[in-house]
């Protein structure tokens, strides 16, 4: 599998391309080498990450975690997040498993999707969950992540069915996390869509002079609300984000 950014989201939405469109699952296994800083982005797929070396700071709009060797993480569908190496970037070994709702449900809109996958994807209060290896209760879940990586690498007959069965078991835990988040998701969901609209506009016009008022209009909010959202969601100002985006290009 490989990943690429697409223009529709101002170089912020990431498109996951699978080896086969018949299996909406992919393991991103970069191997040894320098691990770069990964700027703000999002993708429709769910993500399970697992570290076998080094340390990474994960940031979402509202949370921040430092993961070390033996830790894992779940990133929900559509969540803005960024990754920053902690310490030596060459020591980092991150293994990310991406999968769409179709992988577990079989097809969008069927009973499995409606009952178990969509409620998690639509729970905007659930951005990411770190799974620390230092907590004994997490051992079974982390072993599931390791087993998923091994199955994907090995391939062979029936690996797709074994992988889907394994992820179905892990999903019971993920579904429980979503239920615990309560009713805060609707308000957060609206803010997420506004910040994505403004990031998309910056991505489309980064080569031009721009004002905060123009950025705010992309999400139909005031200048003040624009500043508030950037501070709350990304920890920066609209101007600072635009300047950083230009440098990355």
Labelled PLM ranges:
Residues 127-138, 151-208, 212-219, 232-244:
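Short, Lys/Arg-enriched, Trp-marked, Pro/Gly-tolerant hinge/linker segments that flank
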Residues 222:
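Helix-turn-helix DNA-binding motif, specifically the short coil turn and the N-cap/start of the second
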Residues 142-149:
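Short, Lys/Arg-enriched alpha-helical recognition elements, typified by the DNA-recognition helix
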Residues 111-142:
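Aromatic/histidine-rich interaction motifs
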């Amino acid at each position: 599998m490989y990943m690429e950014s697409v223009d529709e989201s101002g170089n912020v939405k990431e498109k996951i391309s699978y080896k086969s469109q018949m299996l909406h699952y992919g393991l991103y296994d970069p191997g040894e080498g320098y691990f770069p800083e990964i700027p703000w982005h999002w993708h429709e797929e769910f993500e399970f990450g697992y570290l076998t070396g080094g340390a990474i700071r994960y940031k979402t709009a509202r949370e921040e975690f430092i993961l070390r060797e033996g830790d894992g993480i779940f990133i929900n569908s559509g969540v803005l997040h960024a990754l920053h190496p902690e310490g030596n970037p060459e020591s980092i070994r991150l293994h990310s498993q991406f999968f769409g709702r179709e992988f577990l449900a079989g097809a969008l809109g069927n009973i499995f999707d409606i009952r178990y996958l969509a409620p998690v994807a639509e729970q905007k209060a659930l951005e990411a969950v770190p799974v620390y290896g230092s907590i004994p209760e997490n051992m079974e879940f982390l072993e599931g992540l390791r087993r998923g990586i091994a199955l994907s690498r090995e391939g062979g007959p029936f690996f797709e069915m074994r992988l889907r069965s394994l992820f179905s078991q892990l999903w019971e835990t993920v579904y429980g996390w979503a239920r615990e988040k309560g009713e805060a998701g609707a308000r957060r969901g609206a803010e997420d869509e506004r910040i994505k609209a403004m990031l998309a506009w910056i991505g489309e016009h980064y080569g031009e002079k721009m004002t905060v008022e123009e950025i705010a209009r992309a999400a139909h909010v005031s200048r003040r609300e624009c500043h508030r959202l950037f501070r709350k969601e990304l920890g920066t100002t609209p101007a600072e984000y635009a300047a950083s985006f230009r440098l990355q290009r």
